[in-house]
C-alpha cells in the first residue's frame, strides 16, 4: 500500500488557526490546541453578538426616541401610536437620528403624532 503523506495539509490548517489567533495572549496565540479552542469560542461569541447587536441598537434607538418625545410632552408608546395613526412610516433608527441631530424636525413629528391621537 502507498504511503500517505499529509503533513502539508495539517501544517496549513494549523497555520490558518494560528493566524486567526494572532494577538491573543500567551499560549492562545502560540499553541495550536489552545489556539483552536480560543478561535472556535471567539467565532461562537461573534455569531451570537452579531444577532445581539441588532437588539442592542434597537434598545438604544427606543431610549433616545423616548427621551426626546418626553421632552415634547408625549410618551414613547403614545408617540409611536400617533405616528402610525397619521401613517408616518419612519423607522426607529431614523427617528432616533432626527431626535439627536434635528430637534425642530422631531418636535414637528411629535405635533403630527399628537394630531393623530386627537383625531382617533
Curated annotation (Swiss-Prot):
Alphabetical list of PROSITE patterns matching this protein: RIBOSOMAL_L20
Signal peptide: none
GO CC annotations, alphabetized: ribonucleoprotein complex; ribosome
Highest rank taxon of the organism: Bacteria
GO biological process terms on file: ribosomal large subunit assembly; translation
GO molecular function, one term: structural constituent of ribosome
Record-stated family: Belongs to the bacterial ribosomal protein bL20 family.
Cited function: Binds directly to 23S ribosomal RNA and is necessary for the in vitro assembly process of the 50S ribosomal subunit. It is not involved in the protein synthesizing functions of that subunit.
Protein name: Large ribosomal subunit protein bL20
Species assigned in the record: Pseudoalteromonas translucida (strain TAC 125)
This protein's encoding gene: rplT
Amino acid at each position: 500500500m502507498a504511503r500517505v503523506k499529509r503533513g502539508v495539509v495539517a501544517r496549513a490548517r494549523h497555520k490558518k488557526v494560528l493566524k486567526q489567533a494572532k494577538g491573543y495572549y500567551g499560549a492562545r496565540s502560540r499553541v495550536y490546541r489552545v489556539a483552536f479552542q480560543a478561535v472556535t469560542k471567539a467565532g461562537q461569541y461573534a455569531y451570537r453578538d452579531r444577532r445581539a447587536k441588532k437588539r442592542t441598537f434597537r434598545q438604544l434607538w427606543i431610549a433616545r426616541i423616548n427621551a426626546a418625545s418626553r421632552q415634547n410632552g408625549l410618551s414613547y408608546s403614545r408617540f409611536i401610536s400617533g405616528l402610525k395613526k397619521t401613517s408616518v412610516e419612519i423607522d426607529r433608527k431614523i427617528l432616533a437620528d432626527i431626535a439627536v441631530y434635528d430637534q425642530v424636525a422631531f418636535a414637528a413629528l411629535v405635533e403630527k403624532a399628537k394630531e393623530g391621537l386627537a383625531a382617533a
